[in-house]
Amino acid sequence: MSRRKNAEKRIVNPDPVYRNRLVNMLVNRILKNGKKSLAYRILYKAMKNIKTKTQKNPLFILRQAIRKATPKVAVKARRVGGSTYQVPVEIQSSQGKALAIRWLLTSAKKRAGRNFISKLSNEIIDTARDTGNTIRKKEETHRMAESNRAFAHFR
């Protein structure tokens, strides 16, 4: 880690089709081995699936899903006097959004299904409807933070 100055935040450019930064953030997380065009193709086909299944704007559904999956608090392990406490910490919106995207993709990968396109589209739709593993993960994180609220003064 550099001691000179804080690293600049990298600005995420919007994607070419939807002109949205959120879509590009999702593509960058889908990306494997530098194959960005494949990641774009997967996401755009998933968005097309969402449009056919819901008859609504897929970008609206995606935004809604990520908004509902974004956590407000997280727990951080903090060692105090030989024992480790899970300390609840409020997180910034950008960090919460990144967590929501990560949870969305891991939940989609764990789903049963033929291919990743259908799994991803189904997970996005389920998250937008307040069901699915992504929402369960968010609620579990909030529950953890609530149960460890007594350790909040260890920040």
UniProtKB/Swiss-Prot annotation:
GO terms for biological process: translation. GO terms for molecular function: rRNA binding; structural constituent of ribosome. PROSITE patterns: RIBOSOMAL_S7 (PS00052). Gene3D superfamilies: Ribosomal protein S7 domain. The lineage of its organism: Eukaryota, Viridiplantae, Streptophyta, Coleochaetophyceae, Coleochaetales. It comes from Chaetosphaeridium globosum. One of the primary rRNA binding proteins, it binds directly to 16S rRNA where it nucleates assembly of the head domain of the 30S subunit. Belongs to the universal ribosomal protein uS7 family. This is Small ribosomal subunit protein uS7c.
